[in-house]
Structure formats: C-alpha cells, structure tokens
Amino acid sequence: MKYSTSKLKFNLLISASVFSILTGCGGGGGGYSGGSGGSPTYATTTTTISSTPTTTNPNTNITNTTPLLMPASVPQPVVTGTDIVGVNLQNTTSSPLAAHVFTFGQIFKQGDVLPNDTLVARINGTAYPVQLDILATWPADGSVKLGAITLTTPAMIAGSTVGVLLAKATGSDPTFGTTPAVDLVSASASNNLTLNVSFSGVSPSPVDLAAALHTALTGSPTYWLHGPLATQARVDVPHSGSLHITADVTAYADGSLTADVQFNNDFTTVLPSTGAANPAAALPALQYTATINLQGTSTNHTVSQIQYTDWHVVRNTTGAPMLNVSSSTEPAINVQHDLAYLEHSGAVLPYDRTTGVANDSTLYGSAFYSIAYVMGTTGFGTPFASNGLERYMGQTGARPDIGYTTMWNTVWLMTQDSRAATVALAQGDSGGAVPWNFKLANGHWLTPGDWPNIFVGYNNGPQGGTDGIANYSYTNYPSNDPTAWYTDTGHQPNLAYIPYIMTGQRWYLDRLYAQAAFCEISMTPFKSSPYQASGRYAGQLTSDPSLANAADIVITPGNQLRGSAWDMREIQEAAFV
C-alpha cells in the first residue's frame, strides 16, 4: 500500500517573463529549472560506495578533525531503475542512540519516483520499509519532487554514521502492506494528550490545543504526514488581536508524540486606498510569558513580540523522536544529502565540489570561524534571535547573509556538516522574527492574489493610490534598539528554502511562503507605478492593453533591479516547492 499526502499550495502570482532578471544582479539564474529534459550535465565527484553501506565510527565531519571538508560521500545507486539516492545519518552526540522513527526531506529528480512507488531504505544490506509523504510534484509528469521520508533508524553508537540508500521496493523487500496509518485521534486519546499554552501578561489563558486538535480531527483534517510510522496534523487557535497559536502535532507508531507550537502575531487588516495617511499606527509589542505543557512537562518562554512576527518551540514526549530542528545545540541526528544529486535535480545551484571548505574555527574570516562565533553568541537559537543575520538589511558590502543564498546555507550544502546545519536552521527560524509575516483572516499570506493594489513599503498606508495594511510602520526602525529589524528586499537574506527542502518541516515552508509573499507586496503595484504616468517609462509597459490593470505583474520600473531579483528568487523558490 502506498502512503502519501499532498500539501496545500501557496497562492502565488508569478510573471514568468521576468525570471531572467535574476542574472542581472549577480544572483545567477536557472537554478530551479530542473527536469529530465533540460538538466545540464556536471562532473560528479562524490565517492561511489557499496549499495550495502556500513556503519563507521568516528565520522570525521562529526569529530571536526579533517582540515578540509569535502561534499559528503553517501551511498550511490548500483541497480539502475531501482536505486535512487543515498544519504548518511549521523549521531552527533557522545551517547548511543536507540532505534527510533525519524523524518527528513528529500528532493527527487524528475521521473525518479512516481506517486505510486513504494520505497525502502537499504541499510547494511538489509531493506527497511519507508513512509513517503509527497510534499511537491513535478508538473510535467506528476513524479515526486519533494518528499518527507520517515523511517526507523538502526541503533547508532556515539559519533557514528549510517549510510542509507533509498530505493524502489522489489518483490523480496519488506513493505508496510496493509498496515494502517497511525491514528492521531486514537493516539491522542490513549495518551490522554494534554497540550496547553498559558500566558502571563496577555489574556485569555490558557489555550487547550489538545481539545482543538481533537475537534479538528473529527472533521476533515489535512495531514502533513500520514502513514504507518507517523501522522501529523495542524490545529490553529485564535488567541487575541492578531495573535494565534498553531500546533503541528505528530503521533508515532510507538505511541509517542511531538508538538511544534507556533506563536504567530501576524494577522493583518488591509486598508483600502483613501488618499489619507495610515490611521492605524503600529501596535506596542506583546509582553508575555508562555508556558507550554505537554503531558505534564512544562517549559516557560518570556518574550517581547511585535506585530507581524512568529516564533516556535518543539516539544517531545518521553521517547519521542529527536527532530532535526534548530536549537542552541547541534541536532542529535544530522542528515547528509547527496549534493551532486541535489544539483542535478535543479533544486540548488551547481557548486564546485572539488575545492572543499577549510575546517578551521580559529581562523578569523573563515566560514567555520563564523559558524563557531554565531553559535557561541548569547541567545543563539532563542525566540527572535538574529542568529548571525544583519538586522539592518540596508547595510551593504561583504555580508555573508546576502547572495543567492547565505554563506551558512552554502557551507551546509557543500559539507553537510552538522554545525553549518545548526546555524542555517536557526536562521530559518529568524525569518519568523523579521516583521514581514502578514496573514489574512482567510489563512492566506497577503499577496496581490487577494488584494491586487496592495503595497507595503515606504509611505505605507491607504495613500498614494495603493492599499496598505494596518498597524505597520515601514520607518519604525529605532537606531537605539539592537533587537529591531529593518527590511530591505534589495539586501534580504535567503533563509527558509534550504532548511525546508532538507528537513521537510512545515514551519520552514511557512517562513518561505511568508517571505515570498512579502516580496510580492513590497514592490510597487504595476497599475499604480508612478512610472506608468510620466517619465521615460511612460507607456512602455501599458502599450499592451492586456497588461493595463494586471494584478500579477510584480516587476515594474519603479523597483531597483537587485531588489526585483532577490524578490523573484524568493517567489521562484516558493513556487518550486
């Protein structure tokens, strides 16, 4: 039996004719074209090893002794048409890890995996059944583009690496057969699930997420994961004002549970154009302590949360799988993907896989010096931390957080090192801390798809011929506040795309969608562009009557080329997955 689920798609409007603009600002182009028909050919430098991978200890990437870190050597396909792609699972801790269920993200080349294919994981010569949840498909043939891979890991000794080869099941391989999907309702009931969030400083309190989840599951739930190893569903509970609490709850076959709880202060109201200044000024930050109680175990988080920001925390019951999520420490299990395969799929840009990355955390200016510095900074991995990013995005020059993707994402891709992964995942979380998360009451991220004349930028508000949003000030960056953010699409970092395709975690897709939506609404609407009425561009684009009031034109002469390029990078990545 095949287990899969499809996610809800983002309400994006894309003008395909402007994709080539990405090459105009040093950003590169064509990194996401993908597909079997037009994929370029690159030299493969990844070491080919047996299709029956072995367990090694220690792994040099984990012990951090290798002077030069090269792309990870992962199991390579041996049987054409059956073997697909390999990964490594690394125990980054100093203690043994028992066998447990684990989920990660995997990009597939077009045509490699069809929706009805059954996958297995070949580990040390033995095949194990795999749960595949389909997160994105290739439009040309419907094959799987991005999947959430859930499997049961073997027991792993401290510092060890286990090679895993994903393959299509053959007649002799074990499968789940008719095993039913984990029943989240029954699992919640049998565990007497309690998942409460209480507040000190804001009301009402508490929020019973377990009861809300039960109500949602008795209707027509949408599952993110749904199979014999794990089932995940989402519940969202409005709290007060623009604050709402979202929880992605996962039940596993052994009865354990995980909850990814989001505190989203992002609901917005659109103000139709009136020609007047914004009458709804920015609201003061919410000051509160949130207590999250899962099965009787509580944690407290005291935060100051401004509007249009989101943060999250992951809680596990005893025995629940350790997730590959950001925190102040390295993930317990690090997944090493096949960089060459990712490149050939079109999911990432092609890198020179022969140079390596110097593994020196003491050399000032080196990548791993930066990684060590960021991880050692007070507050790293906590809600609203910058995690090494430049809060004033208008700052120019020699910044490791701007480029087609960030330096930390690049090092993660090129080395698959757990330290780089830790920083990159934490920076993916930082996308929630930037005040660019604008959600409508209908659940959509705010885009021209709902409000064609919307503009969030300088002079925000219902003046100047555009619609604006309430409680937002583009110029509210206080120079004396080290925790404030100043957004600038011309220098915005690429935060959530790489974390999402590597982990398959829904939180990172939320962050990707939010940033991409902001990119759409931060560009002057086409029909309201001042360059349409006068100046050297007058009539240039409106000469085609079909474009006169087009809501889906997001690149206009009123925007800088680099800003449009980085905007389209985010929009294209969101559309890709």
Residue spans of the language-model regions?
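Bacterial N-terminal signal peptides that target proteins for export
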Residues: 2-14
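Compositionally biased, low-complexity linear motifs
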Residues: 37-47, 168-182, 435, 516-527
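Alpha-mannosidase-like glycoside hydrolase catalytic domains involved in N-glycan trimming
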Residues: 62-202, 213, 222-223, 229, ...
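Catalytic cores of extracellular degradative/oxidative enzymes
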Residues: 214-577
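Short, isolated positions in well-ordered beta-strands
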Residues: 128, 204, 299-303
